[in-house]
């Protein structure tokens, strides 16, 4: 039986040869100073160009957006030039690549902001930790401070930063952008009543909590077109103080509003289970959003086939498997064995654990 994973589809106006997505994966290997993408990053993404779609790692829309060490930006001329190396390399291999753009909000540290507090919808601290590198890029997890609540007038500036980042991404050669509204970062912080305790037009009711996401979406689609704009949500993310009692209906309402705007796709990530809630949420999102839906969350080939056959989603993203298997689509299609990822090399470092994972053909053709 033919797997639906290998059927062609499209995202906006972009034809895709298969339904296998490489999702955004923070790898913390941008060059310093300046958080600039490099030729090594270009090699990494080009190795994985057989994905139906690559969504490049979460990228800062501004210097103020930063929340982790060694992550790239798309707000300086050097960064745009660095990303052009990446997109050119992927396109030469016949691939397709979007860029995920983000603002970390409260998931940040004063060291990234010259001693100033990170900003957020409200002065509510993030309950978890973020990764911060030391003097020699030796990383470690550190607690986040209580953020400063954004003034109402400042929010428009961040919307403008998202718009400019999208324009910069297109200048750098990306086929589109993904707005990161998931996983507890700034837009998600606005969506949740646990992190958003504002009393102005951006807080309180669900309508108000959706406002920032929709303003960002309108700004980005107005700049580069809806067909080149995707959005990521995480309705079932309840970790680190994000357990909002209406997170699922808020995400479903967001999906409906995004559908009205004609965005290219909706991307959701799941906790990686097969619970009844997972199916219910996928069905609700499908009812609200008729366009392409990408799902991520620890999927195997078998689970991916099943969820595609259900009609609840259209494409499946594979994160850790793509880290270790640059030729993942071929391995999945032919049933070839998979390389095992090396977690110690996920964040920071050099080529080891980044561009040195072998392809299956390379493995099989090693001389005796």
Predicted features and spans:
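Flavin-dependent oxidoreductase catalytic cores
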Residues: 1-368
């Amino acid at each position: 039986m033919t797997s639906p994973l290998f059927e062609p589809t499209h995202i906006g106006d972009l034809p895709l040869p298969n339904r296998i997505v490489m999702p955004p994966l923070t790898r913390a290997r941008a060059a310093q100073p300046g958080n600039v993408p490099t030729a090594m990053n270009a090699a990494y993404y080009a190795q994985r160009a057989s994905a139906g779609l690559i969504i490049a790692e979460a990228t800062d829309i501004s210097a103020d957006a930063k929340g982790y060490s060694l992550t790239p930006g798309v707000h300086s001329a050097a960064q745009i030039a660095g990303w052009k190396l990446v997109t050119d390399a992927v396109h030469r291999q016949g691939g397709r690549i979007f860029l995920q753009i983000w603002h970390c909000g409260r998931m940040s540290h004063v060291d990234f902001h010259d001693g100033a507090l990170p900003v957020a919808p409200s002065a509510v601290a993030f309950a978890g930790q973020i990764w911060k590198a030391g003097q020699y890029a030796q990383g470690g997890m550190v607690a986040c401070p209580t953020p400063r609540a954004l003034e109402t007038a400042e929010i428009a500036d961040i919307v403008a930063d998202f718009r400019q980042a999208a324009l910069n991404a297109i200048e750098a050669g990306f086929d589109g952008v993904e707005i990161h509204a998931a996983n507890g970062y700034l837009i998600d912080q606005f969506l949740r009543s646990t992190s958003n305790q504002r009393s102005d037009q951006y807080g309180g009711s669900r309508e108000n909590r959706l406002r920032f996401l929709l303003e960002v979406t309108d700004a980005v689609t107005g700049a580069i077109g809806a067909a080149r704009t995707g959005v990521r949500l995480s309705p079932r993310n309840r970790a680190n103080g994000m357990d909002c009692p209406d997170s699922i209906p808020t995400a479903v309402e967001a999906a409906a509003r995004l559908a009205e705007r004609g965005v290219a796709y909706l991307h959701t990530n799941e906790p990686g289970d097969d619970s009844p809630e997972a199916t219910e949420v996928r069905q609700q999102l499908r009812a609200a959003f008729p366009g392409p839906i990408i799902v991520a969350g620890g999927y195997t080939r078998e689970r991916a086939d099943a969820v595609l056959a259900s009609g609840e989603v259209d494409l499946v993203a594979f994160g850790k498997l793509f880290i270790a298997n640059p030729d993942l689509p071929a391995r999945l299609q032919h049933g070839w064995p998979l390389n095992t990822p090396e977690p110690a090399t996920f964040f920071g470092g050099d080529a080891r654990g980044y561009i040195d994972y072998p392809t299956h053909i390379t493995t099989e053709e090693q001389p005796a």
